[in-house]
Amino acid sequence: MQQNGRTYIAIDLKAFYASVECMERGLDPLTTNLVVADASRTEKTICLAVSPSLKAYGISGRARLFEVVERVKEVNAERRRKAGCLSEKSFNANELAAYPSREVDYLIAPPRMAKYIQISSQIYNVYLKYIAPEDIHVYSIDEVMMDVTNYLQTYRMTACELAKVMISDVLHTTGITATAGIGSNLYLCKVAMDIMAKHVQPDKDGVRIAELDEMSYREQLWAHRPLTDFWRVGRGYAKKLEAIGI
């Protein structure tokens, strides 16, 4: 994808804080039920991260701890209804899928920001193996955007191939996987990652990559709702836009 002469890649580390905590415990981030939260506070505390296997039960990435507790209770009530009774607990998604009579459990990891910053820096150094720092925009601790225009010919790769190589390197270096978006400008690569990649079938490592240009954006997202899915569109803007029919 190289419309208007430029190509951009956005990369978002998957459930970053939760993935770091899983790796620190020698657990698979994709199959371990884990939330990052300060359990010493009340159950109203906000979870900083929720692992993908817990999100699969309909728990949001920024749930309050009591919402996690209640949802897991509901899941176990349904499992109990089907199995008759539940035996031992498990926080492993593969085990829970294989043994319907096991009770869904999860780990609560207290936040460790210094550790997350350390791992984020390690991952940034992986990106620097492929892309110069002036072409990398660090958007947050777990997300970057890159102008890869001048690298595709050098590496003789498509943007998708380059994204896969970098994500694979991050995975082998840290055990953490990611989602990527590719676009002909920064906005499109971000939206491709935030919206379109969610509907892409993940590969064996859980990686999803989606692409957008101006034409495919119009074709696939012109009527997309809710508007708050789009980058930088909050509830206030969405309400105003919907009021004028947009």
Placement of each model-derived feature along the sequence:
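Gly/Gly-Pro- and Ser/Thr-rich, intrinsically disordered tail segments characteristic of DNA damage-repair
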Residues: 1-246
